[in-house]
Amino acid sequence: MRTLSIVVFLVAACVALPAAADQINLPARKPGQWKIEMLRGTAPAMTIQLCLDTASDKAMMESGLSITSDKCSSVSMTQNGDTITVDAACKFGPMATKSHTVITGDFQSAYTIKTISDLTGGGPLMPKHSETTQNVTWVGECNGLKPGEMMMPGGMKINTLNAMKPMGG
């Protein structure tokens, strides 16, 4: 159960941070399958596959915006060319996080999300400080996934919109 909670938290991070940037006219992502390679500290890389169409991308963005507005006491966003910077202070139940995120890329073929965050109240298994890089690349048409579905390592399929509901999205 603890692993599922961490996965849901990571799913929220994948969706909510780009969604928060939507407030400064972030372009829609290209429909199809996206590969998300998550790198965090010395942990092995985690690769996730995400299938999007126009409707699921919009719904995920709206869900992420809902989480941001409901769970974050402060969000500051700036854009300079193709670089978007987001600073946020958010609370998810007993967990509070402060994060600094830099997003670069075109959202049609690739983008990168680099986040530095500090977490309190997450229990002994949650990292207190983390630096995460998500390298996101478009790989083509969806292969075995429906729009809005995410394939986690080990073959676990998650409907991203359903996963966001417990977090307020």
Predicted regions and their residues:
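Positively charged n-region of N-terminal signal peptides that target proteins for export
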Residues: 1-6
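Subset-of-secretome marker
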Residues: 22-169
